[in-house]
């Protein structure tokens, strides 16, 4: 009988096996091992777990194998009786041999049963030569080969029970009973019988080789062939799930062969190893867990391969290497299509012109960055330099300043990047001279430059210290934006390390701290992108894969259509520049020609050779703003050192370390103030985070604020946010964006517990809609500031104003207010300089806003009596607005006196007449604008009095404010000091007439006052005449005369105020409600109408320079204004305002002289006072 019959008969244990497995499909799906019975006659339980080791099958008990009573349950009823008899005879005669023959192979069967049953038959067929007697006896009982083949496929039927879809395959295989070709593994094993037997039995020590043979023959080759013959789809389902676990089982089973072979007489071997049902259940559960993990891992690998394939398919380089079949040109070492290269260069030049409002003056248009610049722009670095103050607002200084900064960075590199190896070659002559001097003086040679020297002056010692610092920086650089090819380049990483190292050396108080690399990375990318054309396609990809939850179905791998169709070169290509034309030469007029073929000043500012230099100074400018968030102030003031000499240095170092370890109060305070503003717009979210959960704001917002959202949003979205943040103000606009981020995830935070809420805050959901985020941030800012105005709360954040137009004036720093010519006393000035808050107004158009156009107020020494009266009347918001408005006017006029001092200094420096003429034109219109605004305020007072005529307290308060504003207007329009300079007395406005008209107005009844106010003041501007400035002596005389007249006028006003109060009380009692509603649209004051004015006033002959009314003398001797002195008014702490716009950034050149810029004063006052034309 052939050897193959042994393997076939072994598989044909009983047809009862197949019937029982059909009856218990649930158990079959959980099979974990394959175990045959031990062959004893008295052992009625044969534990058999056939096939599918990846399923956790419970043990299937097949009873009474020695009996022939289960014939009705077999699938092949004709052969079942013979099979059972044969097995019984084998079990009686050759019990031990049967066990030995199946000892190792049964274990191997439980591993390989899922891969294909042909492998099992071959393994059992390998062992038939050793136990020849038992095999012959066993095979004699199995003369029916067809039955053996049926039993073989009965085992396959067991696999079919796992999935009912394989019934057809099972039936087809059973029909091929005599076809031994299907059993490829059996044929291979029979042909190589001698080799297998020799390796397996004659050489018992070489069991690892046997394992290799089994693995190669059965696992890799035979399993695939036989299993594919049965069903290909089933191979895909089960093959991948059993690679690791089954192979391990196979190795373990082979290791147990020696024991089974040496103890061939041990009939209880299988009983001890396979009859533990409790352990099988635990093992099956563990196997099921491993299989699920492997399945998920396999799905993930397939998914990643699919993603890579999509990237390759969608890559424009692979799909369309040369889209237009144009001529290829070589730029450096890279070949690119000529037409695409020309288009890129043309776009690069046009981008520079896109950010300016006027190309002749290079006036930048900040509205372009309201919602961020375009993603693919190449002028982002220039915009950032101007917005952060790296470049001034004056374009004529750009070339000179850029050359100076680039030379300065080269000096930093030479001083801080030390290499003793190179220094030895460069300074060889100097060292020889020093050695000669030392030999002449008979002194020993110094070992300062020895590599083992510990001296601070040693170059080697400094070199090793620098290496340690750079190594610390490199750890963070390697983790910066992983996955982006730009930051994985070694040359880019070296540049980032060098920039951060030089900064730490240049600013030892700040040094380098973790997070600075996140701030430098977007800056370096922007500067490099502005000067190079390279493959930055991965920056614009959107990957929303959730690695933690392994949610692949929400994965969105989408490129914008624009970037998908773009062509990208194989390597970086520098844009064409010609910096020789600008190298230290400066530019004429407008700061350089933008129409030159070499790219003009735009090409000079984006020179690829200096992108590292430019990146450093942008980073330095940004760190001057946010550097306070990286420093830690000492918890207590440092006492003076008690030691001197060499130990003093050690004392200073210990104090420095203590300062570094102190709590960073600045950034934490910023987080707390930001969170407190949340209660004005989202009180529910505020109370839930603070009271219900007790989450401290700095736990999550400190990382947002310190590194300016660098780790929250992807790089392409972060660049858009930074455009708007730099345009507005980093320290002022960034908190509003953080509040907006909290509001947008409100639904994900509410009703969450402490840990879940922190999880959402620490891993902020990524959003790609940056315009929506910025638009919401602008709205949040307006709502918060309106709420603070309503509750009369000092606003700590500035509000932007419209951009300047041609009407502008220069702005300077806030200087202490003088006591001689201002209305603020010394105590108020001292308090106002101690701290700063901000007054707020909302601009009508958010897009025309700029961060540096802010109003900063100083905290004063107390509030006025008017605001205190209004608090209990329910009208505090309205009265506070009126009070702040007219007091702001006083402060603006007060500021003129301080700027007059700078005007004198500028006149001494021989200012040109053209510049003075521009200031004259601007300030003439400004004075007209101030007068018109005062008139509108008075009109508002009258209108308010008419509507609240029955409210006596409010009526008196408004009336008092109206009188104060009237007195201010009198001082502006009344000029008694110019009488001596006027030849025509008819062309002046006497002060007495104004006083008389004021008294007559106050003495009339409210009804008469309304009827008299039938027309607004009429101010006629005459044509401009030649202007000559009065000398300083004349000005001093005029100021003295003006002060005397002011003293007289104040005495008269005090006497008349008492009469006014008495008359007002009588008027209010006699006034009827119906009379207060007449003529609502009339002018608010009668004393300035055409009847009371004797002559028309011309404001064309006034000169206003640096916030001061300056007396001038014209040929026609028209009306002129002198130094203004205003009545004392109590100033509230919220009303002192420092005017600052985007053009008022004070920049100091190398000599330390302040460089002031111009701004639109007219639009600024219009926005602040709330009056829009």
Curated annotation (Swiss-Prot):
Residues 299-313 have a biased composition (Basic and acidic residues). It comes from the Eukaryota. GO terms for molecular function: GTPase activator activity. InterPro entries: Rab-GAP-TBC_dom, Rab-GAP_TBC_sf. Residues 22-203, 217-324, 425-446, 823-872, 983-1015, 1054-1089 are annotated as: Disordered. The lineage of its organism: Eukaryota, Amoebozoa, Evosea, Eumycetozoa, Dictyostelia. The gene is tbc1d5A. SMART domains: TBC. It comes from Dictyostelium discoideum (Social amoeba). Signal peptide: none annotated. Keywords: Coiled coil, GTPase activation. Residues 314-324, 983-994, 1079-1089 have a biased composition (Polar residues). Residues 26-107, 127-203, 217-290, 431-441, 995-1015, 1054-1078 have a biased composition (Low complexity). May act as a GTPase-activating protein for Rab family protein(s). Residues 163-214, 885-930 form a coiled coil. Residues 374-729 form the Rab-GAP TBC domain. This is TBC1 domain family member 5 homolog A.
């Amino acid at each position: 009988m052939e050897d193959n019959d042994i393997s076939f008969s072994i598989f044909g244990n009983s047809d009862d096996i197949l019937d029982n497995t059909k009856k218990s499909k649930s158990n079959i799906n959980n099979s974990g091992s394959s175990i045959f019975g031990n062959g004893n006659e008295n052992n009625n339980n044969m534990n058999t777990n056939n096939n599918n080791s990846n399923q956790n099958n419970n043990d299937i008990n097949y009873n009474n194998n020695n009996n022939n009573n289960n014939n009705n349950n077999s699938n092949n009823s004709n052969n079942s009786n013979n099979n059972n008899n044969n097995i019984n005879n084998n079990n009686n005669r050759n019990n031990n041999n049967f066990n030995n023959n199946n000892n190792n192979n049964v274990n191997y069967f439980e591993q390989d049963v899922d891969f294909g049953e042909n492998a099992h038959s071959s393994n059992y067929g390998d062992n038939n030569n050793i136990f020849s007697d038992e095999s012959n006896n066993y095979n004699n009982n199995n003369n029916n080969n067809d039955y053996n083949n049926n039993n073989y496929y009965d085992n396959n039927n067991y696999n079919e029970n796992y999935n009912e879809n394989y019934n057809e395959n099972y039936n087809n295989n059973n029909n091929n009973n005599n076809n031994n070709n299907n059993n490829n593994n059996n044929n291979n094993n029979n042909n190589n019988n001698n080799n297998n037997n020799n390796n397996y039995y004659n050489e018992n020590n070489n069991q690892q080789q046997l394992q290799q043979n089994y693995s190669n023959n059965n696992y890799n080759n035979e399993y695939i062939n036989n299993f594919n013959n049965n069903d290909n789809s089933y191979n895909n389902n089960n093959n991948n799930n059993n690679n690791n676990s089954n192979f391990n089982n196979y190795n373990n089973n082979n290791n147990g062969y020696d024991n089974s072979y040496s103890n061939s007489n041990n009939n209880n071997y299988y009983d001890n190893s396979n009859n533990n049902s409790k352990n099988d259940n635990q093992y099956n559960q563990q196997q099921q867990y491993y299989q699920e993990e492997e399945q998920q891992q396999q799905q993930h690998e397939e998914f990643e391969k699919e993603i890579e394939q999509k990237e390759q398919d969608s890559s424009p380089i692979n799909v369309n290497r040369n889209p237009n079949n144009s001529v290829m040109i070589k730029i450096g070492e890279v070949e690119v299509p000529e037409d695409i290269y020309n288009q890129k260069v043309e776009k690069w030049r046009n981008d520079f012109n896109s950010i300016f409002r006027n190309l002749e003056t290079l006036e930048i248009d900040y509205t372009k960055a309201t919602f961020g610049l375009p993603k693919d722009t190449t002028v982002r670095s220039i915009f950032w330099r101007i917005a952060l103050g790296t470049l001034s607002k004056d374009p004529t200084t750009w070339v000179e300043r850029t050359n100076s900064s680039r030379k300065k960075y080269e000096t930093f590199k030479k001083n801080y990047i030390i290499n003793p190896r190179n220094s030895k070659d460069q300074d060889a002559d100097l060292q020889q001279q020093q050695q000669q001097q030392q030999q002449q003086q008979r002194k020993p040679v110094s070992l300062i430059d020895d590599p083992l020297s510990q001296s601070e002056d040693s170059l080697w010692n400094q070199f090793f210290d620098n290496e340690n610092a750079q190594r610390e920086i490199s750890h963070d650089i390697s983790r910066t934006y992983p996955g982006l090819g730009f930051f994985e380049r070694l040359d880019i990483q070296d540049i980032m390390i060098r920039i951060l190292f030089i900064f730490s050396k240049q600013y030892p108080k700040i040094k380098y701290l973790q997070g600075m690399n996140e701030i430098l990375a977007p800056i370096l990318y922007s500067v490099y992108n502005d000067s190079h054309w390279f493959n930055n396609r991965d920056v614009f990809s959107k990957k929303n894969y959730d690695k933690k939850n392994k949610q692949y179905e929400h994965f969105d791998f989408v490129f914008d259509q624009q970037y998908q169709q773009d062509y990208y070169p194989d390597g970086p290509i520098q844009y064409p520049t010609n910096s020789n034309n600008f190298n230290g030469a400066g530019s004429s007029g407008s700061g350089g020609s933008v129409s030159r073929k070499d790219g003009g000043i735009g090409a000079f500012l984006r020179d690829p050779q200096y992108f590292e230099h430019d990146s450093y100074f942008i980073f330095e400018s940004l760190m001057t703003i946010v550097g306070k968030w990286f420093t830690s102030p000492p918890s207590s003031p440092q006492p003076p050192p008690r030691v001197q000499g060499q130990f003093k240095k050690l004392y200073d170092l210990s104090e420095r370390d203590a300062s570094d370890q102190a709590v960073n109060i600045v950034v934490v305070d910023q987080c707390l103030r930001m969170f407190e503003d949340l209660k004005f717009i989202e009180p529910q979210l505020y109370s839930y985070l603070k009271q219900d959960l007790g989450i401290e704001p700095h736990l999550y917002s400190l990382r947002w604020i310190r590194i300016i959202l660098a780790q929250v949003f992807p790089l392409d979205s972060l660049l858009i946010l930074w455009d708007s943040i730099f345009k507005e103000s980093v320290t002022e606009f960034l908190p509003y964006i953080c509040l907006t981020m909290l509001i947008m995830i409100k639904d994900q935070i509410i009703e969450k517990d402490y840990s879940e809420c922190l999880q959402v805050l620490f891993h902020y959901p990524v959003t790609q809609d940056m315009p929506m985020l910025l638009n919401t941030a602008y709205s949040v800012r307006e709502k918060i500031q309106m709420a603070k105005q309503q509750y009369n709360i000092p606003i700590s954040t500035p509000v932007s104003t419209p951009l300047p137009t041609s009407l502008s004036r220069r702005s300077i720093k806030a200087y202490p207010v003088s006591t001689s010519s201002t209305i603020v006393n010394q105590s108020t000035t001292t308090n106002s300089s101690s701290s700063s808050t901000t007054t707020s107004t909302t601009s009508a158009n958010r897009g025309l806003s700029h961060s540096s156009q802010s109003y900063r107020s100083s905290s004063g020494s107390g509030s006025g009596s008017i605001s205190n009266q209004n608090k209990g009347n329910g009208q505090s918001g309205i009265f506070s607005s009126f009070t702040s408005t007219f007091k702001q006017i006083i402060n603006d006029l007060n500021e003129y006196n301080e700027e007059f001092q700078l005007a004198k200094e500028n006149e001494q420096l021989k200012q040109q007449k053209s510049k003075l003429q521009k200031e004259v034109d601007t300030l003439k219109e400004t004075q007209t604008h101030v007068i018109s605004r005062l008139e509108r305020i008075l009109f508002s007072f009258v209108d308010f009095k008419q509507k609240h005529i029955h409210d006596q307290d409010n009526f008196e308060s408004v009336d008092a404010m109206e009188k104060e504003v009237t007195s201010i207007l009198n001082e502006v329009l009344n000029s008694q000091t110019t009488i001596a300079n006027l030849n025509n007395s008819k062309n002046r406005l006497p002060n007495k007439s104004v006083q008389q008209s004021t008294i007559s107005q106050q003495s009339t009844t409210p009804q008469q006052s309304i009827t008299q106010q039938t027309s607004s003041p009429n101010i006629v501007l005459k044509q401009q005449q030649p202007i000559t400035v009065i000398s300083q002596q004349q000005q001093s005389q005029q100021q003295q005369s003006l002060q005397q007249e002011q003293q007289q006028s104040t005495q008269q006003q005090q006497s008349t105020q008492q009469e006014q109060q008495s008359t007002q009380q009588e008027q209010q009692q006699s006034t009827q409600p119906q009379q207060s509603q007449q003529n609502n649209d009339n002018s608010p004051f009668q004393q300035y109408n055409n009847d009371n004015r004797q002559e028309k006033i011309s404001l064309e002959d006034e000169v206003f320079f640096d916030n001061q009314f300056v007396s001038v003398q014209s040929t026609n001797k028209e009306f002129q204004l002198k130094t203004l002195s205003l009545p004392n008014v109590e100033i509230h702490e919220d009303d002192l305002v420092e005017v600052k716009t985007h053009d008022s950034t004070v920049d100091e050149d190398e000599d330390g002289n302040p460089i002031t810029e111009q701004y639109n004063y007219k639009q600024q006052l219009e926005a602040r006072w709330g009056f829009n034309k």
